[in-house]
């Protein structure tokens, strides 16, 4: 989707806030721990290349979801370690090796397929994934991991790391977290040749369970200034939300009692009122279930009335504001604020999803 620079809807990304957020977490974790910046999904909608470059002096490497995301960083001149967190099939190894990209291997089936396809792993850098209870990808026993490491070395790979991922590190009940932690520790203790890097700490683990950190952390949502738990747990230190979303009024009119607004005529005016149109819609990631939520105009909360359309939404105004008046969808407007977590709570989802759904039709301004 093409970025629409010729309309007033923009996302403003504060790179300095991201740098300060990462620094805040780094002060909170043990000295000597390696930091990976998680920049998958275009850095959670903030812009992977720009964020990665901004963090270059502060981090040891980057985590992405897939090979294309890794190649994007390499092509942008990022020369630090890049770890692909998802599974890369053996038929795509050549590009990873050629670009010095570290891959995740999560099963013995992967080795079997590599051998079947006669793939050599000479020069390949690997982290092994352990499924300690997340239930997605990974090996489940020391025996399997030992066999995988031996097999990878036979094929010429350099096994540099081993890691897992916690399912409930952002929840108050730490029962499942502790079960996973003990599982992972026991598995690590059973390794015949433990890789030098051991990591299990995502954002939530890094800030609420810093005493459990091994020798690397993966900082994602916390880097962008958001609470990994939403509103459930208090942050141990302040963070700065790095992304704001704003637009402008492009049409203002008065409607009368009985007039309807939007698809399905789901809103009917009970009295005469001013309605403003804002050029953002569900194609931008501002989903249809945001009807009834409020945005900020002139320091006032203005309700979204009628259904959110693909490209536009409509809001109730207190007066006839001039065209071009600023509309804040995420961020501050005259001492009032709308956070990404506020939106997530309204949608009954998580703040991660709100950010990741903001489409590339919205230009990012740095």
Curated annotation (Swiss-Prot):
Substrate binds at residues 136, 310. The keyword Isomerase applies. The keyword Isomerase applies. Its EC number is 5.1.1.1. Pathway: Amino-acid biosynthesis; D-alanine biosynthesis; D-alanine from L-alanine: step 1/1. It is an enzyme of class 5 (isomerase). It comes from the Bacteria. Gene3D superfamilies: Alanine racemase (3.20.20.10), Lyase, Ornithine Decarboxylase, Chain A, domain 1 (2.40.37.10). Signal peptide: none annotated. GO terms for molecular function: alanine racemase activity; pyridoxal phosphate binding. One of its GO terms (biological process) is peptidoglycan biosynthetic process. It catalyses: L-alanine = D-alanine. Coiled coil: none annotated. Keywords: Isomerase, Pyridoxal phosphate. The modification N6-(pyridoxal phosphate)lysine is found at residue 40. The active site is at residues 40, 263. GO terms for cellular component: cytosol. Belongs to the alanine racemase family. This is Alanine racemase. It comes from Streptococcus pyogenes serotype M5 (strain Manfredo).
């Amino acid at each position: 989707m093409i970025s629409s620079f010729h309309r007033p809807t923009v996302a403003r990304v504060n790179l300095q806030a991201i740098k300060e957020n990462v620094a805040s977490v780094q002060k909170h974790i043990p000295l000597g721990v390696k930091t990976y910046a998680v920049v998958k999904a275009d850095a959670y909608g903030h812009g992977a290349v720009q964020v990665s470059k901004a963090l270059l002096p502060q981090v040891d490497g980057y985590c992405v979801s897939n090979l294309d995301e890794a190649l994007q960083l390499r092509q942008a001149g990022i020369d630090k370690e890049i770890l692909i967190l998802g599974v890369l099939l053996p038929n795509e190894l050549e590009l990873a090796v050629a670009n010095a990209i570290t891959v995740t291997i999560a099963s013995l089936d992967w080795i079997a397929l590599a051998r079947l396809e006669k793939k050599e792993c000479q020069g390949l850098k690997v982290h092994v994934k352990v499924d300690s209870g997340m239930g997605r990808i990974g090996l489940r026993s020391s025996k399997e991991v030992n066999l995988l490491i031996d097999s990878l070395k036979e094929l010429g790979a350099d096994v540099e790391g081993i890691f897992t991922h916690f399912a409930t590190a952002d929840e108050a009940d730490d029962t499942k977290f502790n079960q996973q932690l003990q599982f992972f520790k026991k598995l690590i203790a059973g390794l015949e040749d433990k890789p030098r890097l051991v990591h299990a700490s995502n954002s939530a683990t890094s800030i609420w369970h810093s005493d459990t950190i091994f020798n690397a952390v993966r900082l994602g949502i916390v880097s962008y200034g958001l609470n990994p738990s939403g509103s459930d747990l208090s942050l141990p230190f302040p963070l700065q939300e790095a992304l704001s979303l704003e637009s402008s009024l492009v049409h203002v009119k008065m409607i009368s009692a009985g007039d309807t607004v939007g698809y399905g005529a789901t809103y009917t005016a009970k009295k005469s009122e001013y309605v403003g149109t804002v050029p953002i819609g569900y194609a931008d990631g501002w989903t249809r279930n945001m009807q009834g939520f409020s945005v900020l105009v002139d320091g006032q909360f203005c309700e979204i009335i009628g259904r959110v359309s693909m490209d536009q939404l409509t809001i109730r105004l207190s007066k006839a504001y001039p065209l071009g008046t600023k509309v804040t969808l995420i961020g501050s407007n005259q001492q009032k604020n709308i956070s990404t977590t506020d939106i997530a709570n309204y949608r009954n989802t998580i703040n991660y999803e709100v950010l990741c759904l903001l489409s590339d039709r919205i230009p990012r301004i740095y």
